[in-house]
Amino acid sequence: MKIPQRTRGYLAIVIAAVLFGVWPSLSKRVLTEVHPFVVALLIQLVPAIALSPSLRRLRIARSDWPLLALSGVVGAVAAPIVYFYGLERTTASNSVLLSNSEALFTILFAYAFLGERATPREYLALGGIAVGAFLVTTQLRFGDVQFLGFLIGNLMLVGAAVCWGTSNTASAVLLRRIPIFPLLEVQLIFGTVSFAVLVPLSGAPLAVPSDILPDLLLLAASAVGMFSVLFFYAFRTIGAMRTGAILPTSALWGILAAFYFFPNETLSVVQVVGGALMVGSLVVFYLFRGPTETRAAGETLKPEASDGPDSP
């Protein structure tokens, strides 16, 4: 039985949300031993090497280069710098919460610049996902989520979310004409080359402790490489707005990842309720999804690319 393309798109973003949820915990562990610039370099270098064959016979229109440069510089250079330095200056719970703001900016930019719209029922389900993510990440214990005490770090995480939201919007447009793998590879090259220059200028040591290396490789392969491919595939099949709407479910997986890496932590009743609300809202969002054919009202982002909708 063949799985419909739209269903594959929803499955892709759900899996991507799991990987995205693991990102803060893995990053926090790695940053305890490795300089932020070195982390940003290596987690982009590894998938860039793996995806390098995709550049063969790639042709990019001259008119696409400004947008491609914007997505690469903002998403692969500026965002990692702001994010990793912000992550060092805030708590793990804050980082899980504020990572969801990338989805918010992706949705807002899709609405404002891509002309994407959702149905009233989808907006309702989207609200349920947002509320569930809020419950999971805060547990309604606002004294523990120290926003004021970690204001600079929190603001930096929000700034990184704006950068990634901008890059996502640019990528959504580019994916209409450029296949997923080559687009991601070019963006990773922007990041790799930039940090290859910044690392020696900053004097950061390149040495990575052997006990941290597995976490770093896992971060590069899953939270950067696999996540980006699945994320872009969802962009092309269900649109940027719906992709951004489902991404906040990463908060649930983020809490579970934190529980795995830090076994002394436990899940509260509020978190269980929030997780159930997110999963239920996700099911509702899929069941009541609106039309997305080429003539669907108000939506402009379509899965059109030079290699067809099913090819990466």
Language-model features and meaning:
Residues 30, 39, 86, 112-114, ...:
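Hydrophobic/aromatic residues within transmembrane alpha-helices
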